[in-house]
């Protein structure tokens, strides 16, 4: 993540994040903590590859994810990483109910909205198509899904995504969650 991160030290990152969140709030803007549980220990860029972080859950929670624990009541939203943490789950965090429902919502007590990262990124393609990625993200605990880098097709990708979600709902592959609806 390099220069896109506040700092290597979780305490410093926490202080800087609090300052940014305060400034955003004063300007009338919401905040989003990203990329849960952390993106700092991988070399690969999830825009172009599928990063893998082989650390244990204990190590991740003690380091990268620590600011999420400290800031869970202050964050308006969180965006999970398209990173695989195989010692925790075989799926990238954004497609993992263990990361989103059990750890982020359950263990850390986060109650805000969860946005997927861009489903057109290479790191998201492990789920398959954009529709498959959206279903995986929504079923794992995301409240909203993002398809950001498809603007050159005149909206066809977004239309296909919406059609796919409607078909999935009609066939029972996806059921909108009432709690998730309320967070939107």
What name fits each language-model region?
Residues 8-175:
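Second-shell residues forming the walls of enzyme active-site clefts
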Residues 1-4:
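A glycine-rich phosphate/pyrophosphate-binding beta-strand-loop-alpha-helix module
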Residues 175-184:
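Short, intrinsically disordered, charge-balanced linker/junction segments flanking boundaries
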């Amino acid at each position: 993540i390099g220069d896109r991160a506040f700092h290597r030290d979780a305490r410093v990152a926490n202080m800087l994040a609090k300052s940014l969140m305060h400034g955003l709030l004063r300007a009338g803007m919401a905040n989003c903590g990203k990329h849960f549980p952390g993106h700092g220990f991988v070399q690969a860029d999830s825009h172009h590859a599928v990063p893998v972080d082989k650390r244990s859950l204990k190590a991740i929670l003690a380091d990268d994810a620590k600011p999420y624990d400290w800031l869970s009541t202050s964050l308006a939203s969180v965006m999970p990483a398209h990173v695989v943490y195989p010692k925790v789950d075989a799926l990238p965090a954004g497609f993992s109910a263990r990361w989103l429902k059990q750890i982020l919502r359950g263990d850390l007590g986060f109650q805000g909205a969860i946005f997927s990262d861009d489903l057109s990124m290479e790191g998201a393609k492990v789920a398959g198509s954009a529709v498959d990625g959206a279903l995986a993200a929504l079923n794992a605990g995301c409240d909203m899904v993002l398809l950001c880098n498809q603007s050159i097709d005149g909206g066809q990708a977004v239309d296909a995504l919406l059609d796919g979600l409607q078909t999935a709902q009609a066939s029972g592959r996806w059921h909108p969650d009432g709690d998730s609806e309320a967070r939107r």
